[in-house]
Amino acid sequence: MEIPHIPVLRNEVVDIFKDLQGLLIDCTLGFAGHSSAILSANENIRIFACDKDDEALDFSKKRVEIFKNRIKIFKSGFSNFLPFLETNEILNLSNVVGILADIGVSSLQIDNNDRGFSLKSDALDMRMDKNASLDAKFVVNHYSRSDLERIFYEFAELTNAKQIAAKIANYRADKEITSAKELATIIGTSNFKNRSISTATLAFQAIRIEVNKELDELNKLLDSIENSAIQNAKIAIITFHSLEDKIVKNRFKKWAQSCICPPFFERCECGNNHAIGKILTKKPITASADELKQNSRAKSAKLRVFEIKR
């Protein structure tokens, strides 16, 4: 079968879980690139995986058919997958030996004209879950100018966020914005300052993050891991955006911190026993030169790994 999406850092992910025995949770199954590679490389791993994209789920079920006795697939968002499994008594999370999350949009979603992720798309959607109520068309046409400015500044770090929001507000006052390529023309496709990425691309990224509540979803996932019954497991998270990477980095630092006393305390009074594990990647793992030749979209990917030992 034709594979529509190249998973980033596939070999590095496989290497992280290669010696584990037990149950792995793939919180972002996508088109099963990582899961199928892990199952092929390690016969001692079983996987529970989820995704909320029906197109991805349909494809993945066919792709992993040869591993059907070792993988179970669920329709769920990654932020509530662990609580879903626990609440429905589907499994005991203390048996989990690994968790994988790839917090990014697949190449197929980006390239699919109907999904509205691309600057050249005739649609204006950007929903990862087609059943979700909020889409990019609503954000662009109905959010206030100040809310648009906030999104562009917070989620894309655009210093000209005010001007971009004004362009959109002025345009939509006369005509509803209905396509991504129309929006890209309004914003402008010139590169932002000295960066090798266009202003429109960054603005689209910000809108996508807002539509899918991506930062909130990531924080909820990390909360669910922290508050779960998981005892011994490797947590591997791939991000594609500096804000997402910062969230993961800071949460891992928190998890590795034994003393949680305020910095002005002269001595520890908390028991110095609050760490739930250790960071396995001092610096994030990034794509090799060989991978970048095959998949330029892997350039912004960062993989961080934490080992829980409670």
UniProtKB/Swiss-Prot annotation:
The UniProt entry's GO CC annotations, sorted and at most eight, read: cytoplasm
Q: Which reaction does it catalyse?
A: cytidine(1402) in 16S rRNA + S-adenosyl-L-methionine = N(4)-methylcytidine(1402) in 16S rRNA + S-adenosyl-L-homocysteine + H(+)
One of the GO BP terms on file? rRNA base methylation
**Subcellular location(s) of the protein:** Cytoplasm
> Which annotated residues bind S-adenosyl-L-methionine?
32-34, 51, 84, 102, 109
Q: Listed GO molecular functions?
A: rRNA (cytosine-N4-)-methyltransferase activity
Q: What class of enzyme is it?
A: transferase
Q: Keywords of this protein's UniProt record, alphabetized?
A: Cytoplasm, Methyltransferase, rRNA processing, S-adenosyl-L-methionine, Transferase
Which EC number(s) does UniProt give?
2.1.1.199
* Function, in words: Specifically methylates the N4 position of cytidine in position 1402 (C1402) of 16S rRNA.
The family line of this record is: Belongs to the methyltransferase superfamily. RsmH family.
* Name listed for the protein in its UniProt record: Ribosomal RNA small subunit methyltransferase H
What gene is it encoded by? rsmH
